[in-house]
From Swiss-Prot:
GO molecular function, one term: translation initiation factor activity
Species the sequence originates in: Bos taurus
UniProt record similarity statement: Belongs to the EIF1AD family.
Oligomeric form and interacting partners: Interacts with GAPDH and STAT1.
Protein name: Probable RNA-binding protein EIF1AD
Gene this chain is encoded by: EIF1AD
């Protein structure tokens, strides 16, 4: 199987299905990445340990601090105690919260992170009244990447009216 085909199948698997953890699996949050395809994670109970990334995810899926994973325990591991079995994206997290499979300790963390991101990405503009509630959750741009290395230019309505009049 070529590298492109492998990548296509791995990405399709990660983005496509909604997985519920089994009895042995755990939902964990990534704290840091010390390297060599190892990630330090924290469970809902506060236990910290290392997890390894299987070779099918390497160079295909990137994991960053704050992401959530489903891991399988490794019995013989001393430092590395689990292996990543699934990477959870925001849609998976919402689905697990709705189904009641999400740990309470992480629900507080996700709400706090969402509030922090909204404060960072939303410029402080005067509040405008909402239009007739036609906006759906699919139009929510709060999870889009914002490049912080670029200046944010905000054009006011007064400036645009002056330009149109000239």
């Amino acid at each position: 199987m070529s590298q492109a085909t492998k990548r296509k199948h791995v990405v399709k698997e990660v983005l496509g299905e909604h997985m519920v953890p089994s009895d042995q699996q755990q939902i964990v949050r990534v704290l840091r990445t010390p390297g060599n395809n190892l990630h330090e994670v924290e469970t809902a109970q506060g236990q910290r340990f290392l997890v390894s990334m299987p070779s099918k995810y390497r160079k295909n899926i990137w994991i960053k601090r704050g992401d959530f994973l489903i891991v399988d325990p490794i019995e013989e591991g001393e430092k590395v105690k689990a292996e990543i079995s699934f990477v959870l994206c925001k849609d998976h997290v919402r689905s697990l919260q709705k189904d009641g499979h999400w740990p309470e300790a992480f629900s507080q963390v996700t709400e706090k992170d969402n509030n922090d991101r909204n404060r960072q990405t939303q410029p402080e503009l005067p509040a405008e009244p909402q239009s007739s509630g036609e906006e759906s959750s699919s139009e929510d741009d709060s999870d889009l990447f914002v490049n912080t290395n670029r200046r944010q230019y905000h054009e006011s309505e007064e400036e645009s009216e002056e330009e149109e009049a000239a």
